[in-house]
């Protein structure tokens, strides 16, 4: 249920203006009616093909893109903010002379559609297409300048044909492979989850179920082959937020260290290799830990430890990766009975298995150095293992004795010949010693894991391979693509992949030997489809290949990408990997997909929550917002601003806002309320304020229309009045400021503030007191500056005042430096550092002149009371400070 909007009624339209204004200014209803006006102009833009991309243009190309949405069927305010920001940028770049590509598509595969289909007993394709139609209509009402001719939906076979084609490219390039692996299994959705899809509590990001661990044969992509490039090339992304680059760098997780080999006691053939970033602490190792799944565990475990090891491994199998590595959870393990030799000291160390060591991270084995690793000291204390300090520094011993590992630098002790070395130097010294002796190797590792793309569900892109008992894994011939999903099947939502139950679809002939074979029944992670969609937008109607190199050269990289911070790791990292992999396959020339990235903040609204029960209360049920109480219990309610959500009763339906105020008001509010990257707090009063601003502009243009017949300025008169000079100066200051706000760091809220200041200056000057050339220039500039933000009303203004063509096809206004020159300026007068007034002075006045004018001013007479100041501080062009 959506929340309410506009607690107070506005002085909105009553009678609709039924016809378009024309160049000859035919009489019209004098009231701003956004409903009729906006619908009329959108229809005209569509008829004129105003938003169609210029493919053969010699103009520079500019690709503006919003992260495409999942078609839930319901547009929310987060969508509105995302798409309106991108639309403003696209419209400005068109007016600046670029050929702009501004497309839209649908990230349409995935579990929500399949689950909805199960709940409603409807085909997910039918449900998805219906939602797409509904959301397209909702987006259209916002007045977005989208080229709908390039629309793509990832669930349509003419799109996922090419997702399959690209998968085969990766398979041929050795970047796609299968392996048995421990995977995160969602017992509710019955599918495998990537690590990134499991939250910090070990729950599925979608169903909320506690995730289990299972061994399955899965498809992976070798994103780790690109770990170094993905990390290093973050430095190229100067147009990305530092926060996103840091998040990706941390996720990739580069670590420098050494692999050290520990020989198994009593065996000349068996050894355990560990990776450590702290070879300087090797003398302090008191045990070695293996992952419970490590291949050596069975062979190393002694007979008396078999039962406890087996029981512990079963216990760990029920834990998710997130749970096992959580800092909050106690570390648990059992001994195997085996020992290894510390290669540096010769000491015998016991071998344990523990839940915090993962088989697929590093070597699946770690050395335990309790004195210098917090996780290790907790484990050692819990299991009575030795704690040996090997780095000395002020406060180190005391910290270790108190149970806190010393992880800072210091001086090596208890390390034999390395005693006395700085610990940072000891890292290299001990590694070099080990390399010479043959038990150590310098190594760089990454936290990044290969990308698991297998999903055991129906509504996804089929993986285009066939399993033949004779030939093995056989790619589907490219001429046979797409491998289409069977439609109209029964979806129980349980028991692994629904595709495996479709015998007519599964059973096929092997393309190599002709024998009986079976299709792959896993589908791809939906991020496969969204990791290359921006490339398809460059060449959407190509039936021979997913995109041509020429089209990609024309449009890519995306000049401005807009989307939520929640995609910092998943979508953005995968897209960067795809781009580099396809470059190496010779399909494209670019290294990075997105030149500039803007991560817009969330749209929040007020919530009322009972802190005792945790229950949210609908706004309509709160009788007194100033003293909010739970209507059932009488408890005092918490008042918060939180992300809009139906479950919190604080959602605002965009359609309701547009119905009441019009799309231009909705756009202006969403852009003005907060800087794009900050969270936005919904406020009905501020929506009303933007509507009133557009009404004031309406009245300004109405008044001017009786004076002007067109917007073709005949040039600026030489003999400007002070009032006219002020208007010209305000105009060109606004052009300069708004243009600056749309370059570099996009600041749309301050740009709108400049429009308000300019309109106030024109209005207060009185259009009837300005000569036509000045009024023409001022309104032409104002309307063109307004056009990207409020496109419908700006088009109406342009038409009413006799502008040629569409305002959206006009040039972006440029600054006339001569208009900014001032004969006189305002100089602040301070007395003892406090502002007491101001004077008007010649713009080129020197210090002596300004001092004289200040001393003889009424301000000085009032505050100095005839006394002579001891000191006068003059800052030319700004202020005079009188110090009595």
Swiss-Prot record:
Keywords: Aminoacyl-tRNA synthetase, ATP-binding, Cytoplasm, Ligase, Nucleotide-binding, Protein biosynthesis. SUPFAM superfamilies: Anticodon-binding domain of a subclass of class I aminoacyl-tRNA synthetases, Nucleotidylyl transferase, ValRS/IleRS/LeuRS editing domain. Its main location: cytoplasm. A motif ('KMSKS' region) lies at residues 643-647. PROSITE patterns: AA_TRNA_LIGASE_I (PS00178). It comes from the Bacteria. The keyword Ribosomal protein does not apply. The keyword ATP-binding applies. Its EC number is 6.1.1.4. Gene3D superfamilies: HUPs, Isoleucyl-tRNA Synthetase, Domain 1. Signal peptide: none annotated. It catalyses: tRNA(Leu) + L-leucine + ATP = L-leucyl-tRNA(Leu) + AMP + diphosphate. One of its GO terms (molecular function) is ATP binding. Residues 1-37 are annotated as: Disordered. Belongs to the class-I aminoacyl-tRNA synthetase family. This is Leucine--tRNA ligase. It comes from Synechococcus sp. (strain CC9902).
